[in-house]
């Protein structure tokens, strides 16, 4: 749990406080999605905790296939892949692995993840007091980002089978799978 500024955003000092709280003299893995504000604030937080002699590593999630083509993978947003990276990194840390090993496992997980979102309705961030985007009740948007960033397409609601097929086609086209995977 981390406190947020009044505008709903995160500040570097709050992230530095979270890093300090998490540190148990073994270093801290910063694991987050590829969003400009998060990168800026986590980088600044890392600089701040260097004064406390806290070692930090970073794994940046870029799993959202809707946000950039494969050849621009580094521009992709981080979305659902974070859940898996959190789980594998947490399990490795719980086993007592060192920071480098935990980071390597989280990075391998991040590199193996692909995701694509589907939006049916917006959420309302309490601090903002308004929906993050607008969409009609009979519409769907494939690939919308978690902050309401535009997706690949918006259209009339489709069946669950049609949506699943469209998502799987996009994911499987993007994933470097081979026999036995």
Regions picked out by a protein language model, each given a short descriptive name:
Residues 10, 23-24, 37-42, 53-103, ...:
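Active-site histidine-anchored catalytic micro-motif
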Residues 46-52:
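Short, surface-exposed basic-aromatic patches at helix termini and helix-loop junctions that form
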Residues 1-25, 165, 172-174:
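Glycine-rich oxoanion-binding loops at beta->alpha junctions
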Residues 5-8, 32-35, 75-79, 153-161:
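Hydrophobic alpha-helical scaffolding
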Residues 23-30, 181:
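Short, surface-exposed connector motifs at secondary-structure boundaries
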Residues 3-4, 28, 56-57:
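Hydrophobic anchor at the start of a short beta-strand
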Residues 67, 93-181:
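Mixed-charge interfacial surface used for oligomerization/domain docking
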């Amino acid at each position: 749990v981390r406190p947020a500024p009044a505008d709903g955003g995160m500040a570097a000092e709050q992230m530095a406080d979270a890093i300090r709280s998490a540190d148990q003299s073994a270093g801290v893995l910063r694991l987050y999605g590829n969003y400009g504000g998060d990168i800026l604030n986590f980088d600044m937080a890392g600089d701040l905790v260097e004064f406390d002699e806290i070692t930090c590593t970073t794994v940046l999630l870029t799993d959202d296939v809707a946000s950039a083509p494969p050849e621009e993978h580094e521009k992709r947003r981080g979305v659902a892949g974070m859940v898996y990276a959190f789980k594998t990194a947490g399990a490795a840390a719980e086993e007592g692995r060192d920071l480098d090993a935990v980071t390597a496992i989280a990075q391998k997980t991040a590199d193996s993840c692909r995701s694509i979102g589907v939006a049916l309705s917006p959420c309302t961030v309490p601090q903002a007091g308004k929906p993050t985007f607008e969409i009609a009740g009979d519409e769907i948007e494939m690939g919308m980002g978690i902050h309401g960033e535009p997706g690949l397409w918006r259209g009339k609601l489709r069946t669950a089978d049609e949506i699943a097929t469209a998502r799987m086609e996009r994911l499987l086209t993007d994933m470097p799978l081979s026999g036995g995977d």
